[in-house]
From Swiss-Prot:
Its EC number is 6.1.1.6. This is Lysine--tRNA ligase. It is an enzyme of class 6 (ligase). The lineage of its organism: Bacteria, Pseudomonadati, Pseudomonadota, Gammaproteobacteria, Pasteurellales. It catalyses: tRNA(Lys) + L-lysine + ATP = L-lysyl-tRNA(Lys) + AMP + diphosphate. PROSITE patterns: AA_TRNA_LIGASE_II. The gene is lysS. Its main location: cytoplasm.
Length: 502
């Protein structure tokens, strides 16, 4: 018999015993009661009483009602020490036969298993080892767990199981719970920041007839009643800018985007984005906003402007570096013989790209080639927080052209740890220029670029009504959560990530 078969046999045997216990509970009446009400969380009790002297705590005779999942139990004759875990932390229970009604210790507490959810009433005291504990006087089994905790609660280490059965991961791993608490604080902090700045939170369509706002491959679905193909949105940008045209001059949205692309440690097909738009601002204002926001999040979540990620350490209290895409490519490509002149001539850029092993697509112009060279030689060097600016107009179809050099745009991308975190720009509000750029995207799509943008005629009409000078930015919530939680994979910060079917 294999080791796996032995484990399955043991599991089946343990589950059979637990089901028999549940059957006995059903025979007594309601096996899943719902009238117990706790009045305290474990962490709140620790915060308030861990530093309290044991004798003083005993004299105060503080009565509490707590509830949670049994994580450990240690029987000592007529008493049992039990550790329960609630949403905040863990706390120890002292359950003694003499402190409970007759028969309860043997008939009820004696049948409890690891993983069961219980509610108790009792008074706080300190053990000889100075551990805050609840001396129980009333107990109630609230939920009988039919399956045991993972590996007798030695921890859930199988990554595949952690992602597929996140509930087990959250029960077993304190670090995972901390990660998702941080993620929640990131979202709450962003919302608080923008509301405090006078922005209005809005919701725009997730199902779109024309997917726009980004260069990506969309998911396609079909609306039966309307008999029309629709797309899960790849970005909310064009709808948000319509709102600015309509007079909502400061808007933001925190919501899902969907892109039918690969899955990796940095990519999930369903992900969360912040997008915001501010009238009478430019991309410099947005870079300032971003620095301020990330600094605020670090202080609120971590208590410091120092953010540690893997082997790196970032100080969000310092100004972020700002460098153009062309300058970064020359700076980090110098050891590969790249000079400035290679990036301003099509033939030289194409030859440079091919020398680097880049497969140049027929539909690419100079801007796309230069961007590919940047990604090859420079992107991974942008470790410290860096705003990469002045992207080629060819790869920035929605961004405003730069006044001094119309071949590039007033655009930036934020890189931290060699990864893109955000993307923003002064918005293109010239309807005729936008129409021409959409046409160029259509031509690229017809030439085989399946990530080129669709043309949105109605958006052009909206621009013809007049979009005030505006700047907008998108920030990846998942990647921000990875950063603040020091999580190596995007799957570690998404509760239920996309997984290949078994």
């Amino acid at each position: 018999m294999s080791e796996q078969e032995v484990k399955e046999l043991d599991l089946n045997g343990e589950m059979l015993v637990r089901r028999e216990k549940l059957a006995a509970l059903r025979a007594k009446g309601n096996a899943f009661p719902n009238k117990f009400r706790r009045d305290a969380l474990a962490q709140d009790l620790h915060n308030q009483y861990d530093s309290e002297d044991g004798e003083i705590l005993k004299e105060k005779s503080i009565e509490v009602q707590v509830a949670g999942r049994i994580m450990t139990r240690r029987a000592m004759g007529k008493a049992t020490f039990i550790t329960i875990q609630d949403m905040s932390s863990k706390i120890q229970l002292y359950v003694a036969r003499d402190n409970l009604p007759e028969g309860v210790y043997k008939d009820d507490v004696g049948t409890w298993d690891l993983g069961d959810i219980v509610g108790v009433k009792g008074t706080l005291f300190k053990t000889k080892t100075d551990e805050l504990t609840v001396k129980t006087t009333e107990v109630q089994l609230l939920t009988k767990a039919l399956r045991p905790l993972p590996d007798k609660f030695h921890g859930l280490t199988d990554q595949e199981v952690r992602y597929r059965q996140r509930y087990l991961d959250l029960i077993s791993n304190e670090e995972s719970r901390r990660t998702f608490i941080i993620r929640s604080k990131v979202v709450a902090g962003i919302r608080e920041y923008f509301i405090s700045k006078g922005f209005m939170e809005v919701e725009t369509p997730m199902l779109q007839v024309i997917p726009g706002g980004a260069s990506a491959r969309p998911f396609v679905t079909h609306h039966n009643a309307l008999d029309v193909d629709m797309y899960l949105r790849i970005a909310p940008e064009l709808y948000l800018k319509r709102l600015v045209v309509g007079g909502f001059e400061r808007v933001f949205e925190l919501n899902r985007n969907f892109r039918n692309e690969g899955v990796s440690v940095r990519h999930n097909p369903e992900f969360t984005m912040l997008e915001y738009y501010q009238a009478y601002a430019d991309y410099h204002d947005l870079m300032d906003n971003t620095e301020e926001l990330l600094r605020k999040l670090a202080i609120d979540i971590l208590g410091t402007t120092i953010v540690k990620y893997g082997e790196y350490e970032f100080d969000f209290g310092k100004p972020f570096e700002r460098i153009t895409l062309h300058d970064a490519t020359v700076k980090y490509g110098a050891d590969k013989g790249i000079v400035k002149e290679d990036l301003y001539d099509f033939d030289r850029a194409k030859a440079t790209a091919e020398r680097l092993g880049i497969e140049v697509q027929k539909s690419w112009g100079l801007g796309s080639i230069v961007n590919a060279i940047f990604e090859e030689v420079a992107e991974h060097h942008l470790i410290q927080p860096t705003f990469l600016m002045a992207h080629p107009a060819e790869i920035s179809p929605l961004a405003r052209r730069n006044d001094e050099n119309p071949d590039v745009t007033d655009r930036f991308e934020l890189f931290i740890g060699g990864r893109e975190i955000g993307n923003g720009f002064s918005e293109l509000n010239d309807a005729e220029d936008q129409n021409e750029r959409f046409d160029a995207q259509v031509a690229a799509k017809e030439a085989g670029d399946d990530e080129a943008m669709f043309k949105d005629e109605d958006f052009v009409v909206a621009l013809e009504h007049g979009l005030p000078p505006t700047a907008g930015e998108g920030l990846g919530i998942d990647r921000l959560a990875m950063l603040y939680a020091n999580a190596p994979s995007i799957r570690d910060v998404i509760l239920f990530p996309a997984m290949r079917q078994k």
